[in-house]
Each structure stands twice: as C-alpha cells, then as structure tokens.
UniProtKB/Swiss-Prot annotation:
It is found in: Cell membrane. It comes from Bordetella parapertussis (strain 12822 / ATCC BAA-587 / NCTC 13253). It comes from the Bacteria. Its EC number is 4.1.1.98. One of its GO terms (molecular function) is metal ion binding. The lineage of its organism: Bacteria, Pseudomonadati, Pseudomonadota, Betaproteobacteria, Burkholderiales. The gene is ubiD. Prenylated FMN binds at residues 180-182, 194-196, 199-200. It is a peripheral membrane protein. The active site is at residue 314. It is an enzyme of class 4 (lyase). This is 3-octaprenyl-4-hydroxybenzoate carboxy-lyase.
Amino acid sequence: MKYRDLRDFLAQLERQGELKRITAPVSTRLEMTEIADRVLRAGGPALLFENARHNDAPADMPVLANLFGTPRRVAWGMGADDVGALRETGELLASLREPEAPKGLRDALAKVSMLKAALWDMSPKTVRSAACQEIVWEGADVDLGRLPIQTCWPGDVAPLLAWGLVITRGPNARRQNLGIYRQQPLGPNKLIMRWLSHRGGALDFRDHAQAHPGKSFPIAVALGADPATILDAVTPVPDTLSEYQFAGLLRGSRTEVVKALGSDLSVPASAEIVLEGHLLPADDPRAVAAAVPEGANPPPATGYEMALEGPYGDHTGYYNEQDWFPVFTVDRITMRRNPIYHSTYTGKPPDEPAVLGVALNEVFVPLLRRQLPEIVDFYLPPEGCSYRLAVVSIRKQYAGHAKRVMFGLWSVLRQFMYTKFIVVVDEDIDPRDWTEVVWAMTTRMDPVRDTVLVENTPIDYLDFASPVSGLGGKMGLDATNKWPGETSREWGTPIHMDEAVKRRVDAMWDTLGL
C-alpha cells in the first residue's frame, strides 16, 4: 500500500473497511482500552474515537487506536501487500546490512540500483514549512493535559503516552535515532522518558552527558507520524541507514522532515503533533528535585533531572516495578490543524506489540538466515510477549549444531538479547505448530542432556521473574534428532504411511461416504 502520511493511510483503511469511526462519547480513562482490546482480539478494524472524553470533558481532538491491530495492517504500513511480502522487506534489510559480492554483471547492476535507491534516492527531504508546525503552543500555553492521553489500566499511576516517536542524536552519531519509549506525564510540561539503557535514545543521552556534562539534551517526540516511519523505529534498520531513508524505501517516496523550532533535530513534517524540549541538568532552575518515597532507593547520580516512573500495566500482562528515569521538559508543542492523537495500550497478549511481533517475525527470518543459513524458519509466539520465546527450525548438519544456533540467535540481532527461551527443532517440524513442537520436545529431548542454561545474561527490566533487575538466565532446548556423538543409542525412525497406499485411498475417498 502506498500513501503520503497518516491521514492518507487512514483514508485508504476506511475504503478497505479497516477503519471504524466511533461517534459515541468514550472516555480516555479505561473505556478506550476495553473497547480497543475487544476489537483487537476479534481481528477488527482501526478505531477513530471522534468524541473522546478526557478528564470528564470533551477532548480537543479525536483519538486513533488499534492502528496496527492486525498483521495485515502492519504489512500495509510497511508498504507491503500482505504479511508474506514482508519476507522481501527482510531480504532488503539483510542486503543493506551485509551486501553480498555480486554474482555477475546483472547482479552487480541490481545491487548498485538498490544501494542508490536506499542511500541517495530516498534520503529525507528537508522542507522549510510543514503541517506539523501549523499550530504552536509555547511557554505558559504548553499543557500536556490538553492532549487526550489514555489511562489504560486501573492500577496505572497516571495516563501514559505510548506511541511517541522519540527523536534524539548523540554527539558522535552520524544520524538521528528514532525509538518508541513510553512516557509518564508529571505535569503540564514534564514527562518521564522511560528508555532502557541499551536503547538508542538512552545511548545518545549517555554519550551527550559524557561529552557535555551539565548541558541540556534536546529531544523531540512525534505523535501520529506516517506508519512507515513509526514502524521503522521497531525494525532492525542498519546503522549506515537512517530510519527516515528506510521509511522512504517502504513508502515509495522520500520522507519529508522539517527542522524543529527549538533544536537542530529533524522531525516528520506530516506528524500530527510534535513535542519539543530537553532533558535538563539537575541544577537547572526549571528542574524539579526528585521526590524519594519512603523505602524507595534514591535516584542514580546522573547529574540530570530524574523521577520515579510507574507502575503501569505492560505487555507482559502485569504491572511493572517502579524505577528511575530522566525527565523530559517540554518547551513547546506543535501540531497540525485539527490534529489526531495516536494512542495504544499494552497488556497481556495479544495487544498491538504482540501483533507487531507477528508481522515483524517475517522480516527477521531473512536477516537471521544471512547470519545462520541453516535456519529454515523462525517463530516468535505472540503468547511469549513477542520476543521472550523463540522456536527455530534448522537443517541440522553435525552434533552440537542446535547449541550453536541458540547462541547465534542470542547474539545476531539486538532484538533477541532478551529472548529467554529458544527451542531448536529439525526442518521436518513446523515451528509455528505447537502440536509438532511439543511432539519434538517430548520425543527428541533428554531434559538433562538437551537443556542449555546460561546465567547472568541481559534480561528485560520488565521481567520480574529474573532474580536481579536486568540480569537473569536463559534456556535453550535442543529438540532435534540426535547425531552420533550426542547419543550412544539407536535413534527412533518416524512412522510414515506408504505413498502408494495414500494415493489409493485418495482415489477411493469419495466412495467411502466419509
């Protein structure tokens, strides 16, 4: 699907019957979550709440939910016709990450054409004026309370800004970083920026704090960017390519950006809303001293304004622990005329992150095959919180091969550093079919011999099951047929019906009255 911006994408969804306008008044507090969750679980359309109620009053703008509520809409957002076509997106990413030597003149010309399109033809286009800056709130006019930010779950500490595209740039970075990080409002102009230490935004901030200690760090947050740009932020785009460039490749047109009004950051020109501001040094007059609740650990000594974030209901299906994160002070809010507020919720799968995982699974397969050619297929079950459990089928070639694949998966892409469980099966097993996977595990595994346990590895900070926050164990399960050297016993022979018998029964089937 080709489109210009979010509004064009929504118009096309509506023509396809994939967008439902809701005119009844619906509250941003809990009601939207319940409605969106029921619709997502039924495989229903994206939702545009045209009469949202916020803080017991009519909201200033409509709220968009469930935009990526089905794998097909994710594929459309990435410029593909269907989920299967995302394998081609993965092939493109694999080629851009690690180009192979051309196999001949024709192949060389094709690779030159691809690189030209990626690195030159689709470089972002900077414009002087943009729709995202048609309206500007500054100074005392900045009020996050006027945005219809959802309160998703009864135990949430506050509303939650969940689809903000966070734009940063470190002092040594060749390009900007785009990331999706949740943000907790603290007041009319402050948000807690919850990013994990290994994420691009956090790394940019760390480098800035080391290079320019005591200096404020500029940030922009885009809400309602075009789908390709949003999805790029959760896709393993090569470090040599900007997310804006890759979004252009997916969309089929250059991404238009505009310089932020208060910094040198480039923001999506068609975004519905943009928040501009800084992370402030702790001694800045605008910074607020951290309030430490009784019994809580004090904030880390970063030299910057910090606050205790959470708890919030998360994609794990549980409320997460509180932790300290930097505070984003919003200097101005720019927006389009009649803006749309893009929102979501996270909860026990399936939710939008789980649906994204199903679609992005197809992108990952070619990337993994480039590093591990023996991989036949790869599956991240959505019930596993999108990334915590993986099942991979391989063409086994030697004893111990499954263990090599386990450690390869944990190392190849940053997306899998938090995968706790990896199940490796042979190519005759469909990793997407639990009946086959369980059969392989129960017939081809010895629990002692074929289980790999690794201690003290990086783990998602939201994983309260780990003994230490951010550090825990991993398990690999080798459910492949065992080769000489892995067993001293004669291995079982699978049962298969004779093909000639199957053909004879096929021929007589219609006469059997079954």
